[in-house]
Amino acid sequence: MGCCLSKKPSPSLPSSVKPSDPIKPMEPVIEPLEEEAKPKSEKLNQEEEEEEVVVIKHTRSHEERSKKTESDKDSPVSSPVAAEKSNSTPLVRISSCTKEEVDAILIQCGKLSRSNSAAKTRRYSGSKRSFDFDQNERIRGGDAAEEDGMQRNRHRGVERVHGSPRERRRRTPSRERERSGSRERGNVGGGGGGSRRVSRSPAKRSEIRNADSCGSSVNSSNNRPGKFVTIPATDKSNNVEPLVKRITVKRNIGDACRIAASPRSKSPARAGNNVPSLSRSNSRKAEQSPYRRNPLGEIDQNTKKMIESVKPNSRTSRGPSPSRVAVVELTKAPQVVLSRSRSLRKSRDFDLVSNEDNNYTALLLKDIQSFHGKSVDDSVISLPLCVSKACSIVEAVADLNSMTNRTCLRSDSSRFRFTSTVKKADLMEPSFEKYVTVKRGGGSLEESSGSNNVT
């Protein structure tokens, strides 16, 4: 406060030096007026501190005010008529001095008490300040119109510079854009809350950007952090059916599909399925998933196809075929010319009887029984029934192989038949002929009927 009051005599000294000699006796008048103004200004300051009135003023407005007060001081000092008026009405002179001093004191108090003012609520601070200043000016009895204009301008500047931190923070261009976007959204919604501030959480931020860019339902589903569905681009023509495309779905385990018109329900994987049920059980999730398969239906189709493909094979294998009989006849006929073994005699009997019975298994059994009956008489040792069955199986396999290899039927199959029949003869008639070896270097044949023909 002392430094503020020390500044005041500095402009008054050159003003007192400038005028002529008859105005010099005004100097002692100004000094007691200033001394009287000091306790009054201190009293006003104490009253304002008791009322806890906080005032924040701009420095430029104070400089303009100080210039105006200096010009006001110069004008009464220069004219003696004004000096006489000031002597006659000392209250006006006191009020002009105390305005400047009170302004300086209030500015300094405002600088000191800015931290306290920041702690208070700032919603109605402007109106309170203007009301307090107007009251102070009315009490002092100064020019009310000029002071009101000055105070309003000063408060506008103060509010512009020393506004709330939220207002200062929201003055950036990006935040201005966001405010305009939020106002437009509020006007479109028609709720009347266009100036309402939207929260800046990440979820809301993504919602704002998606709503501004494109208002598609796929982007709006991203607001839910529990379920993300990414769908590739599809043809927009309704007439053409889209190709089967893969849909990647990432969702929580317990989150069921609650929307009937979701992209998952429109997927091509569900094209042939029925209308989804309205139940909220967990089975509905399995019904609507595009990866769901119907294993029973697939097994039924596969088994039907397998049964249809297996049935003709079993029939052809069991039933008689004239081509097979003809092949047997063709392959067995030249064997009579090649050798005269007992197995060839058996095949000769088989060829003669084949026209009577067409069942292939019956023919095999009949041939085995007839051969077994003859071999008992000729052979020394009789073989069990399992060996005869094995021989019949070997012959059946030979017949099947001959059917598959029709290209080399007359050359290779005849040799194979011959060797198989020789082996069969060896199995059915175990005699000393098996143990007779033939030397290719020119050895003599020793009572061997079939072993010397083996290549």
Curated annotation (Swiss-Prot):
Q: Give the classification, highest ranks.
A: Eukaryota, Viridiplantae, Streptophyta, Embryophyta, Tracheophyta
Low complexity biased stretches: 1-20, 260-271
Q: Organism's domain of life?
A: Eukaryota
Q: What is this protein called?
A: Uncharacterized protein At1g65710
Looking at the UniProt entry, the stretches that span the membrane are none
Residues of the region (Disordered) are 1-234, 258-304
* InterPro entries given in the database record: At1g65710-like (IPR040412)
Q: Where is the composition biased (Basic and acidic residues)?
A: 35-46, 61-75, 129-143, 156-166, 173-186
- Spell out the Polar residues composition-biased ranges: 213-224
